[in-house]
Structures are given as structure tokens and as C-alpha cells.
Regions:
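Nucleotide-activated sugar donor-binding and catalytic core shared by glycosyltransferases
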Residues: 1-169
Length: 169
């Protein structure tokens, strides 16, 4: 980790029935991140998920320079550490669960769009809600810091249950 730079984390999902991880989609995302890292003097960290194909990780390794940290295997400690130390989070659009996990941090989350193979209505509705809640923005050519209320559904629901229980006594 380069302590003289802020970190930008890219969490890669993987192909599913809605999204393919073809070279063109990846090239657009990688090129955009490379430009943002240069523009804002950032170090990139790339973390795979269970669905990330090995050839996607290999492509990232050949595309980025040696300053980019690429975790080659799924590693929960590396994932949680990277979420913690990174100033900016970029998550591919194919994973609602990784976007939700990132929203627990309260940090700016950018969604890297991938062309869908078929109607991705459920994914679009999820992203529409998170955009409305000011949690996510589309990855483009600039980075900003913004605030939103962290998602903490476990405590929120626990408090509702407590109130309902106390009302019965």
C-alpha cells in the first residue's frame, strides 16, 4: 500500500445470466480507472469475488502497472481491509450484494456499468433505489466525496422489534 496516496477499490463481480465480462466491457472500466488514478493521484486496489473468472484477474494484472494491487484469490480479510482503507469504492453493476456491503461503510460508491445481455430490471430497480438514497453514482470521469446515511438494516430492524415488544408490556 502506498501511504502517500489515497486508495480506490475496484470490486469485480463476474458473469451471470444478465452480464458478460467480455474484454470490451472490462477495457472500458479499466481504462476509466487508470485515468481517474492518474487524475486524482490514487492507488488502485482490485479484489475479485467468487464469480470473477481467472482470465479477468489475469487481464487486470497485464493491464495495470505494478503500483496497482491486485488480489488474485478470493480473500475475505483482503476484501474487508480494502473496504476499510479505500477512499473511493467502485463495484461492478452485476452484484447487488457487494454494493449493499459497501454501503455499510458510508463511503462514496461508484457503480461500473456493464452492458446487459438481457433485461436486468431487478438490478436496475436496485440501483435506482440506491441512487435515490444518494448511496451510489455511476462511474464516470470524475470522483467526488459525498455523504449518505449508512445502511445498517440489522440494527434498524432490531430497534423496530424492540419497540413492538415493549408496546406489549
Amino acid at each position: 500500500i502506498n501511504r502517500d496516496k489515497k486508495q480506490l477499490l475496484l470490486v469485480l463481480g463476474g458473469p451471470n445470466k444478465y452480464y458478460s465480462y467480455d474484454r470490451n466491457n472490462l477495457e472500458k472500466i479499466f481504462e476509466n480507472l487508470k485515468n481517474l488514478a492518474k487524475k486524482y493521484d490514487l492507488q488502485i486496489i482490485i479484489i475479485p469475488s467468487m464469480r470473477t473468472p481467472i482470465n479477468t484477474i489475469e487481464h487486470a494484472s497485464s493491464f495495470f502497472d505494478k503500483e496497482t494491487i491486485i488480489v488474485k484469490n478470493v480473500d475475505k480479510k483482503a476484501y474487508l481491509s480494502a473496504l476499510s482503507i479505500s477512499e473511493f469504492l467502485v463495484i461492478t453493476c452485476d452484484s447487488t450484494s457487494m454494493i449493499s456491503e459497501a454501503a455499510l461503510t458510508g463511503k462514496p460508491i461508484y457503480v461500473a456499468q456493464i452492458q446487459s445481455k438481457k433485461d436486468d430490471y431487478r438490478f436496475r430497480q436496485f440501483r435506482k433505489l440506491f441512487t435515490k438514497l444518494n448511496i451510489i453514482r455511476n462511474l464516470e470521469d470524475k470522483l467526488e466525496v459525498w455523504n449518505y446515511e449508512k445502511l445498517d438494516e440489522t440494527n434498524r430492524v432490531a430497534n423496530i422489534i424492540k419497540k413492538k415488544i415493549y408496546c406489549h408490556f
